[in-house]
Amino acid sequence: MNPVDDSAAAGREHDDPAFTTLIEQHRRELHVHCYRMLGSFDDAEDAVQDAFFRAWRYRETRREGAPLRPWLYQIATNACLDVIARDKRRTSLTAAAEAGDDVARSVDEVTWLQPYPDSLLEPTAPRESEPDAMVVTKETIELAFLTVIQLLTPQQRAALILRDVLGWSAKETADVLDVSVAAVNGALQRGRATLRRHLPSRKPEWPVGVDATAAERELLRKLVQASEEPNAALFESVIREDAVFRMPPEPGVTVGRDAMIRLWIEGGFTTSMRLRCVLTRANRQPALACYNLGKDGETYEAMALDVIGIDQGMIAEIITFPPTVFERFGLPASLRNEP
């Protein structure tokens, strides 16, 4: 890791507004870090606010001249660990992880999962003048990864994120977690093993030689068409046979294309809904914002956000979130029914 060297600004930190300005520069990347730790956009917001309060309160305790960024990461990580410790949903999963009980751990128990707008990830991308700015790659933010790391113990999760995602050294990670290097290496080894068990071998989204941009555009066009017509047969043509469907915060998972389509038909998809879909992106994945025509026939009301997972040119996963997430995506609550 090449920590951002904030020591040059140390002399200004006696001026409280200057200290606030300094830590605010790290808000975006700390929010992404807390989101990875917690899997929830809302909980990440709270954790960052808590971390900034702690940083402000204990700003005099930071060693003079020490880099600010690692210190803030330590505070933010501890804030996340406190959130996990207070949440019975999370502690039940982490207790099973501590016991090595894979049977008791399942992705459908991660009911607090929330999507992250791509538009809010862009400010952390590096610029030539900021070589240490965060790069948020798909592999480190996609929902499949975020879900599985919620099954890790808190220490395993933190070690994996700091070491494998952020690229920190074992010593730097040990300093953040206030444990030995041996403890970090052990937690990382166990965390990696869990990821290998729960995440299948990563395959390309598209076959070799396929224009991925054009192929994704065509796949999404068919998905939108199938949703708006509606057309169950067209749905069937774009969804993989072993695809999965989840609806956080509801528990449970629907496995298999036939089961998914049957569930949607039983829910009135082909009879009582008239949808309009807007393309967006979440977690570096394509997403559809779905609106359903209201009883007045004049307005489409926000219904759900579908985040799409693609594997080898087919839809392998759909995770549906409630319309409460629309605002953070900059999506309107309703659309006019216009020709």
Which functions belong to the PLM regions below?
Residues 260-339:
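Low-complexity, glycine/alanine/valine/leucine- and proline-rich hydrophobic stretches
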Residues 154-155, 162-183:
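Helix-turn-helix DNA-binding module
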Residues 175-176, 181-276:
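Solvent-exposed, charged amphipathic helical/linker segments at domain boundaries
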Residues 12, 40-41, 52-68, 82-91, ...:
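Sigma70-family region 2
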Residues 2, 9-32, 42-45, 56:
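A short, charge-rich alpha-helical start-of-domain segment used by transcription regulators
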Residues 14, 112-156, 213-217, 221, ...:
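Amphipathic alpha-helical segment used for protein-protein interaction
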Residues 46-53, 66-78:
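Structural recognition of an alpha-helix C-terminal capping motif at a helix-to-coil junction
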Residues 83-115, 198-207:
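Short, basic/polar amphipathic helix motif occurring as a linker/hinge flanking DNA-binding modules
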